[in-house]
Structures are given as C-alpha cells and as structure tokens.
Amino acid sequence: MGAQPEQTQKPSSRVQTLFKRVKAFFTKTGPPPPPPAPSRNLGCTHVYGYVFGHLGEREPEHSPSQQVLDTGEQLMVPVDVLEVDNEGALWKFLLSGAMAGAVSRTGTAPLDRAKVYMQVYSSKKNFMNLLGGLRSLIQEGGIRSLWRGNGINVLKIAPEYAIKFSVFEQCKNYFCGVHESPPFQERLLAGSLAVATSQTLINPMEVLKTRLTLRRTGQYKGLLDCARQILEQEGTRALYRGYLPNMLGIIPYACTDLAVYEMLNCLWLKSGRDMKDPSGLVSLSSVTLSTTCGQMASYPLTLVRTRMQAQGQLGPFSNLAYHDPLPLLSELSHDPPKHTQTDSQTLHI
C-alpha cells in the first residue's frame, strides 16, 4: 500500500520535470558578461563606476541614449551603442540621432545664426548684443532669414555621425580587438581620432555652413552656387579655412569635459550615494555641466575658427584677411569686445 502513491505521483513528476527542462531550454542564458566599460565619449552618457576603479561592480543595463541637445557644436563621440556588437542597433541609433539632431538644430537655428553673426561682425567699436543682432538679421532678410544655413547644418549630420562612429569602431577594435572592451584612456584616444577624421572630411561643409549663415539676401542662389563662388574666387584652400583651430579645439574641450565629469563623480562618491544607479536627472546634470565647461574652454579657438571660415576676398567678408590663426587670436586677446564675446559665448553654450 505504501508503494502505490509513488506509482500514481510518478507520471506527474515526470511531466513537471519535462516542463522544467523545456523552460530552462528556452530561457537558457550564458554566464553573466563582464561589466561594460562606459562610453564616456565626452558629450553624452555614463562613466559611473568605471573611472574610479569600480570595474568589478555590475552596472545597471541601459539603452543607448543621447542626453545633450545636438546643436552641431559637440565634438566628442556621443553614443553608448558602440559598445554593443549589433550593427542593427548602430544603424537604428544613427537614424534616430540624425532625426533628433535635425529637429534640435532647426529649433536652435535662429540663435545659432545670431551667434555666428555676432562672432564675425562684433568689435569694440561696433558693439552688438543678442537683441541687436536678431533685430539686424530680421531687418535685412525678414523672419525667415533666421534659418539661413540651417539646411547645410542638418545635411551634414549624417556624414558627420557615420564617419565618427565608423572610425571610432575601427580604432577601438585596433586597440583591443573586436570582443574586448578598451581601457578608458584608449577609448578617449579612439574618440579623439574619430572626431579629428570626421572634422577633416566635413570641414568644407562647415565653411559652406558659415558662409550661408552669414549671406545677404540674394548673395547666393543656394548651396551649389555658394560652393562655386568660393572655388572660383578664393580657390580650394578656402574650403579648409579654420581647420587648424578646429583641430586644436578638440584638446581643451576633451580635457576640460573629462576633468569636470570626474570631479562630479568624486562629489557623487563623497555624498555616500549609490554610484551604480544614479538618477536620470543627476546623469543629465553632470553631462550638461561637463559639456558646457568643455565648450567654454574651447570657445576662443571656436571664435577664431568661425572668423577664419567667414573671411573672403569679396563680399561682406572682405574686411577680414587672416590666413593664420595666431595673429587673429593675438588681436582678440589684446582688443576684445568683451560684452559681445560673452553674449556669443552664451549662445554657443
């Protein structure tokens, strides 16, 4: 009698065992992966738990996100998706990043044009503030003129992002192989090389963007006409004006951005809070502040770059004749329009 319950329960136990095996088969996962190295590519996301030696701690998984408004002035590679070996995710991020960048740059186009206008035409004798600059632009070309140059600014998003991501991925694989995560220093170097390469290739588009942003009503018929006039009147070298200060600007931007971000991490650690899971507001504030400081550090070179890109032999830029950034930087340091520089720097940030 004692063996009969075992015979009646044996089939049900087998069924339970079978279901457990099927469930285990479909939910089977490999060993837990090592903690991912954060993609602190100086302009976008997380470095918590990495810079300060917390490599053994598991970080919460997070989807790729861009936490800084794209106005076209961010230098470093701003993505998390590069850490994922998934080309589909990369292209999805490229598409979503391009669409978001187009919206954000279009929304900030009036301020961007006012900034460039103030950077080029302001001087100690010709003081210009934000309202005065916007008023001058509207009087010259109307409300629609505030969006001049926005087309090329949006158009260069796709090649800029694609070159940055491709070069970054190749450099990362070269440093540490395809399936290994590079140290933070090598990741920073890979990001800098990617930015330098992309800026080298799209510098002609930057010059066209500056010229179209500053153009008078009826000066150019469009993008191709602007490029044709530059090539005919100034030569091919004009398309690479401002290249040197643009490259030099990567150094103070990257170093300042990184230093501020690490300082904020130290403050977060000393506060006794959990570093592994900072809130979205904390992460956004840290990235925004570090990026702002980086832009402030590189702003003098950005100003020199813009003035060199705007100069020309004919047209409204004929009063500018700088072929070397050093004389222009020296002139700005000895006789700066302080108030106007502050206003245009605020718009730049």
Curated annotation (Swiss-Prot):
TM region(s), chain numbering: 88-104, 149-168, 188-205, 243-261
InterPro entries assigned: Mit_carrier, Mitochondrial_sb/sol_carrier, Mt_carrier_dom_sf
Solcar repeats: 88-174, 182-267
Reactions listed under catalytic activity: Mg(2+)(out) + phosphate(in) + ATP(out) = Mg(2+)(in) + phosphate(out) + ATP(in); ADP(out) + phosphate(in) + H(+)(out) = ADP(in) + phosphate(out) + H(+)(in)
A Gene Ontology biological process term: mitochondrial ADP transmembrane transport
One MF annotation (Gene Ontology) recorded for this entry: ADP transmembrane transporter activity
Compartment list: Mitochondrion inner membrane
Pfam families tied to this protein: Mito_carr (PF00153)
UniProt entry tagged with the keyword Transmembrane: yes
SUPFAM superfamilies xref list: Mitochondrial carrier
PANTHER family, per database record: SOLUTE CARRIER FAMILY 25
Family listed: Belongs to the mitochondrial carrier (TC 2.A.29) family.
Name of protein: Mitochondrial carrier protein SCaMC-3L
UniProt organism field: Bos taurus (Bovine)
